């Protein structure tokens, strides 16, 4: 793990000197998962954001023994969405796809802004790139300097569903073990799971199967210690699968920072989120921050921003066994809001010591069924670097299809607060598909007030008839007067209610 303050220092240095420690390769790995079709999608942000016309993408299919089957190269030189269906790319069984981007110009970030999709009957899962082969020994020095455990974003065990984990090996065979630990208010359950995986191999582990005697509907915190892998940055894909193990909703795991002492020198971190009235809105905070005791509160804001109510919802002690799980929908009703009144909400963490952990992780959950979306986010702080004198730009993906509904929410992240909370900022949104730009829209909003829209309704004239079977991917670019706005997208399968979502880049 790279320390949060080191991440901020890197951002500052890039803004001062853009050619410093330049990056010319970025990459990701995509697992082939039985029962689903693997795809990737991305907007040519290299060109749109940085005017980089010299980018190539190489996709390599890797077999079950870790050997290359074949590689294909594509020029990325148009201002549009690029989508690649990876499953079926070759006629041999595939373990993993290695996706790489190369450029003679500086790519800046070794992790590309790429969405990974796995879709099957009744579901579509999306997660941004979450593991990669490192570029050189200098990256190894920085990225793997601080080893930490991972924490699951969703421990759910009952007769109909289970948490699962997908472990991926890097470019060398991995022989070692995964150490699983489940902490509840009264017990600790542990197991050591042996691993022997070919290079670029994947292994799916269903928690219910390795802990067969756990109580039904157990609530707790799942922590996982991975074996170290050189030249590899590897998060786990973790999530919730139904009893068939083929239908799932997943995201990447969280850092467990509970043994890392890193703090901001103040006492408040927070983050605003859009409230989607069509869905259940929940947040879950885990006791995996740097050692601390935090007071957690929820601020509920009306659609117009005029009505606001804040209430404390619990104490989060890290390390510890107790998580905080709150239905914002139910809480808002207790606070006197009807669902149609709610426009946004904020999660706030207060410290009484004058310092607060740099990474306070939470799971943002939007749902309609047993498989809700799961979005991994961290709270923001006033000490984080925010460039001055420049516009903000964020971009991301929404899914469209005749059987899918998608919503997009745009909101100020929460820090730093504007001098005038009533500033009415101009928000410009440009939409793209595989043909290029298809639409532009503008809205105005102020601090804490969300812009929320249905993609299908907003772009009804531009997207036309949608496929009954195969979804498509719309990408949006949001330009704002200050780099403090963020976006969230959620997709629901109309037939099953299964959801998936992700934050913007």
What are these regions (language model features)?
Residues 1-505:
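Gly/Pro-rich, tryptophan- and cysteine-flecked surface segments typical
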